Structures are given as structure tokens and as C-alpha cells.
Amino acid sequence: MSEAEARPTNFIRQIIDEDLENGKHSMVHTRFPPEPNGYLHIGHAKSICLNFGIAQDYKGQCNLRFDDTNPVKEDLEFVESIKRDVQWLGFQWSGEVRYSSDYFEQLHNYAVELIGKGLAYVDELSPEQIREYRGSLTSAGKNSPYRDRSVAENLELFAKMRNGEFAEGTACLRAKIDMASNFIVLRDPVIYRIKFADHHQTGNRWCIYPMYDFTHCISDALEGITHSLCTLEFQDNRRLYDWVLDNITIPVHPRQYEFSRLNLEYAIMSKRKLNLLVTEKVVEGWDDPRMLTVSGLRRRGYSAGSIREFCRRIGVTKQDNIVEMAALESCIRDDLNENAPRAMAVLDAVKVVIENLPAHHEQTICMPNHPNRPEMGTRQVPFSREIYIDRADFREEANKHYKRLVLGKEVRLRNAYVIKAERIAKDEEGNITCLFCSCDIDTLSKDPADGRKVKGVIHWVSAEHALLAEFRLYDRLFSVPNPAAAEDFLTTINPESLVIRQGFVEPGMQQALASAPYQFEREGYFCADSVYSTSNKLVFNRTVGLRDTWAKNGE
């Protein structure tokens, strides 16, 4: 991560500053604990930047720990993708990758300790009955009939659970806290359940698996985490976090702090719903460029720096808010405007014949790769008698505000000549098939000698040298600002979230590297698609337009 990226300040950093100043901690130790049941999204990027950024700024440590306590939903594919995404974002975890499953034996022993203290019991209510007995926000829960089993009986039954003598759903281990608590999370939460499923790290060695709230706090303590940072939905869970650590024999007691999660307009952050988009084939996969997964953003052409900058700009607070999509797009637009080399592409081509040039006219024009950064060099672009321009850059008639090519009037070709539209050809349906123009041969990259003013500059590619290319114009996947609020979020899919066009690019794009950014002049920022683009078939993804074209109401 660049040192030029400004160090932020927020309430968490203020807490850390106080802890270091008063000697509570001598070093900061954070962690990023994703569950490997899906790909990371932009919301996880905020947590990554917070946890790894704090460790980096305070010269501390940050662990990458996989919360792998549910083998049914987890997969090594997700483990590898998460590691790849963290590193791509510019961060490196301390030491080896860690897994909650590394601590399964210790977690089991702590569960046994709670049983021995009369603070946990084996319950044989069904999952449905447990939910019913738990009560609601307005009514207290009621005790399970199995709550007062003896320590000896609970130890025996828990051993049978571990040995696979109970079927799934017929028994679980619950913490014995308070069924009348105002906090539902403290109403005898389940801390172990039975799952007969192979685990990607431990195989079939276990058939009982600890729940997140039991695992998380103990894993933090075992790793010496000083500041356990979670999003606000875990605020009530902090009471259980502290209860577990207060009631087991463990020397370290980390503290949990909550911050607001990222809520972004026109986006879904639920892994379950993101998975549904994939399984229902609404999108191609987790790395579909319309998905706000880290891999999807990377494939679309977002840089790691732009995502870090977005996370810096939105900051870290305790108040939930909704961030406009324009804020994310602004970060990548600023990045690419500064760093992306320029090139020319025509997405909806119409041929232009410059009749006063010789039939086989060909020349090379030197163009800057960036108008404001000479250190990025130049490129040689071929120019010929026949070129392509964008269909939207010509009108037979237009008012004075239209500063492109009009029949009988002039326009400048980017870094080339001033041309004049003399006549047009149309097909039987009235569609323009060709423009016949003349050029002022003395205007190559300079103004007309007679001083006449030519307003408007358009881009072009040489028809003889142009490369056929596919352009994937991506837009927001959802058509409403808050798709999660819809009864069926799938009904809010934007039908124009992907528009595919066939066009042409200048020949230098033949060797465009996957994900390398370009500004196609007057069209937007694009990159070669990492999946479909080859030297024989060029496919470019639009990362973002040159300017924000969405009003706040999404129109």
C-alpha cells in the first residue's frame, strides 16, 4: 500500500491510541476472520482495510483466520480466493494463515470446562423447539426440560455427541446463561451442534462443530488479539463474547469493538443472496464484473488502490448509513484518469471515406499515451483513406450545440486532420452506411491556415488496420437503490446491466494485457477481460464511464 495514502482517524484508532498511551497494550494485534463460504465483496474490503491498515500503521500484526466452523457451506475454492483477494488489495497477514479449526481440540476442552462448571448442558429439544422456547423481543424464553441435567450426565452425553452417537438435529450443547435475559443472544445459546460432513481442513475427524459466537472469542484470545473489530450487527453478541471468556480459564481477554457495515446503493451485500445470483445464473459467477465482489471488481478493471481509497473516504463510524454508488465510481474514475493510457475505440462504427486522399494512402501519426503525463510516452497509430467513426458522432442536421460532424460542415479527427462531410450513402431502410468526406491536408495536428474555427474533436480508427473487438458495457446490477428491501430482490435486476457491442480498436490493442486499464477516448475506461479476451478475439469490459451519468434517483 502506498505511503501516499493518507492515514485516517476514527473512533477505533482513538481507542488504540489511548490503549497504547496508558500501557494497556504494547503492540496492536488485529485479525480478519472471514467464513470461507463465498467470495469477498466490497463490504469485506472495508474490514480488510480497517484491520490490516491499523496493524500496518501501528507496526503491529494482523492475522488472517478462516472461521471454518460449518463444513457444509465451506470450500477450499473460497479459501484460496480470499487469500488472493487480501493480497491483491495490498495486504499481507502475519505469520501463517490460521483456521478456527486449528483450535477444535482446545475449543472442545473449553466446552467441557463449561459443562464441568455447570454452565453448559446437552439439550435434546429439536431446532424448532429451541427457537420456540427462546421467546421474542417482547416475551421471555422458557427453560428447556433438559436444562437441569447433572454435570456427569452432560459430560457423558457430550462425549456421545463427539463419538457420533446422536443424529444431526437430535442434540446440541447450549451455554447455561439466562432464558429471561433482555438480550436474546444470552438465552442459552447453542455453542455446539452435530454435522456429519467432511471438513476441508480436518476431514472427518469431527462430527460436532462449535458455533461462531463460541469460537470467535476463544480464537481471538488464543491468538492474542488486542482489538477484535466487528460490524454493528454483532453489538449484542459482545455480551456473549465477554461471558464465554469470563467463564473459562484463559489468560487473555480481548475486547470487541463494533463499527458500521458498508451499505451501498444499488448493491447486495448478503452472501446468501450473492450466492443465489450465481446459482440462478443471473450472473456468470462470483467474478462477474457486475458483482461487487473483490474478484468481480478486479475483473471489471477496478484497481486495488481505488478500493482502498474508497474505504478511506467513507471512513469508520458507529452510525449506519447508505453510501452512493457514485462515491465508489468516483474513486476508480479519479485513479484511471490519472494512470490509464489513452487509446481509441469505436463501439458503433460507420465508415468514412476521405475522397481527396489517394486510394492507398497510409501514414503513421504519433499520439501521446496520456495528455498530461509525457513520461508515459507515445504510440504510433496508422491513418488511412478509410476510417471508422462512431455513428453518434454524425448527424445530417444539427443545432449549434452539436459539436461533432454534420453534413456540409467540419470537425477535427483526434491528432489528425480536419474533415468535412460532403455526402452520405444509405441502405434500403434509410440507415447510413458510409460517409464521404474531404480533408484539409494542411491541418495535420494544427489549425487551418485561413484562421477558420473548427469546433469539435472526434475519435477514429483506421478501417484498414482496425481490430475487431467486443465491448461489454456494464452498469449497476440492480435498478433500484435498495434491492434488499424488495420482496423478491431478483425482480429488481437491471435489464441493461450488460450491453454487448461489436466495434473496433486501434491495432496497438492487440497485445492488451488482461485487467490493464485504458481510457478509450470519449467512450470511457476499459480493460481487457481476463476470461474471454484473447489475441484472436479481443473483449473489453467497461470499468466506468468518463463521468457520472446517474442522478440520485437512479434515472
UniProtKB/Swiss-Prot annotation:
Main location: cytoplasm
Biological processes annotated in GO: glutaminyl-tRNA aminoacylation; glutamyl-tRNA aminoacylation
Keyword Transmembrane among record annotations: no
Pfam families to which the protein is assigned, alphabetical: tRNA-synt_1c, tRNA-synt_1c_C, tRNA-synt_1c_C2
Principal EC category: ligase
Coiled coil: none
Reactions listed under catalytic activity: tRNA(Gln) + L-glutamine + ATP = L-glutaminyl-tRNA(Gln) + AMP + diphosphate
EC number of the protein: 6.1.1.18
The UniProt record lists the keyword Cell division: no
UniProt-listed InterPro entries: aa-tRNA-synth_I_CS, Gln-tRNA-synth, Gln/Glu-tRNA_Ligase, Gln_tRNA_ligase_bac, Glu/Gln-tRNA-synth, Glu/Gln-tRNA-synth_Ib_cat-dom, Glu/Gln-tRNA-synth_Ib_codon-bd, Glu_tRNA_lig_a-bdl
GO molecular function, one term: ATP binding
GO cellular-component term (any): cytosol
'HIGH' region, short sequence motif: residues: 34-44
Compartmental location: Cytoplasm
Motif 'KMSKS' region: where in chain: 268-272
Keyword annotations from UniProtKB, A to Z: Aminoacyl-tRNA synthetase, ATP-binding, Cytoplasm, Ligase, Nucleotide-binding, Protein biosynthesis
Binding-site residues, ATP: 35-37, 41-47, 231, 261-262, 269-271
Binding site for L-glutamine: 67, 212
Subunit structure: Monomer.
Family: Belongs to the class-I aminoacyl-tRNA synthetase family.
The protein's name: Glutamine--tRNA ligase
Organism, as annotated: Erwinia tasmaniensis (strain DSM 17950 / CFBP 7177 / CIP 109463 / NCPPB 4357 / Et1/99)
Gene: glnS
